[in-house]
């Protein structure tokens, strides 16, 4: 369910890594965790509760485990028929909310005080869910549209949220840029845009190195504000479980504000001309956006004259969902609840979760956890991904081949995209699997500037163009874009129409992790994408023997 309709829901009682190599999940926490079924309580939606292609938990007095795939579940008796696939159906192993602890886990911290960690996790287990199952199901339905080319996913936000930069203005500005980008993409593509934020929970970050060394001093790497601090001292870098409680509180507060923005009038379409940020006003992108906003205003005037007034709910609110990387598994487990209407488990820390490039091992702890939760899932895929491995991973996470369940987030670099992506698309198509393909043009294009700071050239982010070219070639649907961006006027990525240079990086380089697009660069990229969507729409119209509307005045 979207934020726009969340008011109809009733809430339930609302380390220092030893090495950079894998640790076992069982070594991560030595104490036994309870696997009791905790139900998320909300308004029943029988019509919106189709069974999901993931294991459901058996309702017993013993620790909850998933029933075999063929066993019927009382709350969801009608199984979804899988699409034809080349792979043989194999009954999945039994799943429980803590079965990931039997698998090898990468990128997890080791907390020095096991008793304190246990107490914190029990506290979070008792907290209300941050999101609701019905909201996640509604997002899955929308993502299914994107898989079929009927919608476009815009997913964006901070590389890593921080405690220090947590304030309402930053949340509002990022939300506002996403609204602007959505308006541009909707106008260009003439299709709905699904808005999903990397917000309200995007704290933990995987690291390529377990330790960081400065001036001969070696300390554990910073892994995100919900794990340890970024200050380079021993006390700050020790993983602190209390940070998970603060991350929960910040996530809940962020989502509360986002709900207010989405449904309280701020996102009303008639405010389209007011969304421009001050520092983008006198720029090429600001001028282009004002021109587009004027055309939208004219369209709204026509719609009003036709009877669709500006106070209609479609015009005064918007749908907005949240997402983050599923990395810190103890936290994710503590916020997993059993949905009272379907019996399925949902990770109620976010509407959508994704598994990262470093943690997507077929037999790993993160994949084991995610296969049992019914949220829509993303899979980060680099040029290292083997087509056969991708097909197997999709089969594990979506054995019933449910549309909208799986989003493939490609991050390869422009040239690798043209070489590698076609083979992945063909393999998935041959297996009969339904996925939503989107591009992450950020992670495959990170470089180090002469000053030592990480940056990303805006021109290299033209990986987006390669993404569209490949899908045009393969006859598949380019379903969306995934961006690390901010509404702040930062100087972290070089290039763009306002020409941020290497020398400018130090002016406003505020990221706690990786460089982000600023508002002007984000808007510029949305115009590039909108033009590709427009061209695709025109080609599709011609193929269907439909002529596009003539220019105004003809």
Curated annotation (Swiss-Prot):
Residues 41-70 are annotated as: Disordered. It holds the Pfam family DAHP_synth_2. Pathway: Metabolic intermediate biosynthesis; chorismate biosynthesis; chorismate from D-erythrose 4-phosphate and phosphoenolpyruvate: step 1/7. This is Phospho-2-dehydro-3-deoxyheptonate aldolase 1, chloroplastic. One of its GO terms (molecular function) is 3-deoxy-7-phosphoheptulonate synthase activity. It comes from Oryza sativa subsp. japonica. Belongs to the class-II DAHP synthase family. It is found in: Plastid, Chloroplast. Gene3D superfamilies: Aldolase class I (3.20.20.70). GO terms for cellular component: chloroplast. It catalyses: D-erythrose 4-phosphate + phosphoenolpyruvate + H2O = 7-phospho-2-dehydro-3-deoxy-D-arabino-heptonate + phosphate. Residues 1-39 form a transit peptide. It is an enzyme of class 2 (transferase). Its EC number is 2.5.1.54. Keywords: Amino-acid biosynthesis, Aromatic amino acid biosynthesis, Chloroplast, Plastid, Transferase, Transit peptide. Its main location: plastid. One of its GO terms (biological process) is aromatic amino acid family biosynthetic process. InterPro entries: Aldolase_TIM, DAHP_synth_2.
